Regions:
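Mobile, glycine-rich extracellular loop/lid and propeptide segments
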Residues: 22-348, 353-378, 394-420, 443-450, ...
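Bacterial N-terminal signal peptides
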Residues: 2-15
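Blade-edge motifs of beta-propeller repeat domains
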Residues: 318, 490-492
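Boundary at the C-terminal end of the N-terminal hydrophobic targeting segment
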Residues: 14, 19-23
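Detector for outer-membrane/organellar transmembrane beta-barrel domains
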Residues: 416-419, 428-443
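Inter-blade linker and blade-boundary elements of WD-repeat/beta-propeller domains
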Residues: 379-393, 430-436, 489
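Pro/Thr/Ser/Gly-rich low-complexity, intrinsically disordered linker/stalk tracts
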Residues: 526-537
Length: 537
């Protein structure tokens, strides 16, 4: 690992309106429920976001693809530099950057590559290319360590072909390793499934990838693993680490006596509720249709299911929902695991009863709403979950929904961004508004900015070359406020998109990861911008 304070080449051409507001974005999709909301945004409103007042304010180049969502800390005290708002960017080249969130100036850059290691991979599959470094969104604990900590999982390999998965804890101000890190990810779990040996399945780092964002929950860093390049053997791992020591604290495998069942989730972090339960959607894999007396798979294999994981006393499956045709869906590769899970706020139904719900969707175009207190388990004849909205999305989901003001927003592959209203704790069976634009594979993962319940904007990135940033009125998605193709002379163009992008919207800024850096958007000054570009040398 190396720490670099990089030199900069800065080309100035725009006036940038800045804010001293104190909002942080420390985890994937803004909160552990994964709602994608920032309800403290007072600068960007439907009245202030238009092509004449809003646009690209800079591009912060990096040394690899930015698949992870950029994170943000406000008012960070930097030794010798005063107080700055800081943007944290992780790349597939195994680098983590701390940037001045307004100018893009590099505060520090840390390489997580070990000596003689590389992020190049001879497997050359299309899932994560051309490098295999940092794919998952890190998580920040501002209260831990001397200056706050950013936790990152990095993958690499050496010249002998050995692969490494490591959990790092970096000082948020200095970029240095903390707690004796990094911690090499190793695990085993009782079972006779794929890749097992002597009665245990074994975590083989070359077979796995940490795609889903990290979850910080009650002092634990929870990691969830899927296949590297869809190459067997692999199973479904969830591994927790103590946030203060990086020691492994608990292990769960959700297909220990079968195969597959990876945690893909389009890069979405596992969701958590206020009671400390974790929710995931796993991919096609073994599901035991012989059930115990309490309705659980008799061999502990939960492939292609919506799973609730208890964390008290270690990781364990507390409840689940699987579709009646889960085995057939796995065989046809129409599983749930392509999308992310979201925990909804408590809702009141038509009978006045409080409902504790979560929502997810996968490749079959259904929206599945589950009651977190009784998810529905598996029934051979019909789905037993709280609400099943068939065909509402019109396409497969390789993305994550967002929530705002009793509305759920989904962007299925090849379809428009759609809004589904919630009344009496039930989602509308058809969309209540939709964007005019459609979003090619993999669809879009929206984010929301608002000031409380007012001035809601839904932000979405279109994955194409060049990528397109869209802003919609949250009340009516047919009302587009802005997109980055509207300005003349490619003023707001920002390069090719990535598969699982979600914008970071905070303190008057919008940040979008690309194949070679991060594009910054915000309110424009009186002069039309020509862009600010930061080149790292």
């Amino acid at each position: 690992m190396s720490l670099v304070f990089a030199a900069l080449t800065i080309a100035l051409g725009a006036r940038v309106v800045t804010s001293s507001a104190g909002t942080d974005v420390v985890t994937y999709h803004n909160d552990n429920a994964r709602t994608g909301q920032n309800l403290n945004e007072s600068i960007l409103t439907p009245a202030t976001v238009s092509v004449s007042t809003f646009g690209k304010t800079g591009f912060f180049a990096a040394d690899g693809k930015v698949d992870a969502q950029p994170l943000y800390l406000s008012a960070v005290t930097i030794p010798g530099s005063g107080t700055r708002d800081v943007l944290y960017v992780a790349t597939e080249h195994d680098s983590v950057y701390a940037l001045d969130a307004v100018t893009g100036a590099v505060i520090w850059r840390t390489s997580l590559l070990g000596t003689g290691e590389t992020t190049s991979d001879t497997r050359n599959c299309s899932q994560v290319v051309p490098e295999i470094g940092i794919t998952s969104t890190p998580v920040i604990d501002r209260s831990r360590g001397p200056n706050g900590v950013i936790y990152v999982v990095a993958m690499s390999k050496n010249s002998s072909g050995a692969y490494f998965q490591r959990l790092h804890a970096l000082d948020a101000v200095l970029g240095t390793e903390l707690f004796g890190g990094p911690q090499t990810v190793q695990a085993s779990f009782p079972g006779s499934g794929a890749g097992s040996s002597n009665g245990s399945v074994i975590f083989d780092p070359k077979q796995y990838e940490e795609r889903a964002g990290l979850l910080l929950l009650n002092g634990q860093i929870i990691t969830t693993w899927t296949s590297h390049c869809d190459i067997d053997p692999y199973t479904g791992w969830i591994i927790a680490f103590d946030a203060g020591t990086l020691t492994r604290s608990s292990v769960l495998n959700v297909t220990p006596n079968g195969s597959r069942g990876g945690l893909w989730m389009a890069g979405a972090g596992p969701a958590a509720d206020a009671q400390g339960n974790v929710y995931v959607l796993d991919g096609n894999g073994t599901f035991d249709t012989t059930l115990t007396g309490t309705g659980f798979p008799n061999r502990g294999d939960f492939g292609n299911a919506f799973i609730k994981i208890a964390t008290t006393g270690g990781l364990s499956v507390a409840d689940y929902f699987a579709t009646f045709d889960t085995v057939q869906a796995s065989n046809a590769d129409t599983d749930l695991g392509s999308g992310g899970a979201m925990v909804l706020p408590d809702l009141i139904d038509a009978n006045g009863q409080a409902r504790h719900l979560a929502v997810g969707a996968g490749k079959d175009s259904h929206i599945y709403v589950v009651d977190r207190d009784a998810m529905g388990k598996w029934n051979a004849s019909s789905n037993q979950n709280y609400q099943d909205i068939a065909g509402a999305l019109g396409g497969s989901v390789f993305s994550m929904p967002a929530y705002f003001n009793n509305t759920v927003y989904y962007g299925a592959s090849g379809r428009s961004l759609k809004a589904f209203s919630i009344t009496n704790a039930r989602l509308s069976s058809t969309s209540t508004s939709a964007s005019a634009a459609s979003f090619a594979f993999p669809g879009t993962t929206p984010g929301v900015s608002a000031s409380g319940t007012a001035n809601g904007i839904v932000w979405a990135v279109e994955n194409r070359n060049p990528a397109v940033l869209h802003a919609y009125d949250a009340r009516d998605l047919s009302h587009e406020l802005y997109n980055s193709t509207q300005a003349p002379a490619s003023r707001d163009a920002f390069g090719a998109g990535n598969k699982f992008l979600t914008p970071t919207v905070v303190n008057g800024h919008v940040y979008v990861g690309t194949t070679n850096g991060v594009a910054a958007f915000g309110r424009l000054g009186p002069a039309a911008p020509t862009g600010l570009r930061i080149t790292i040398t």
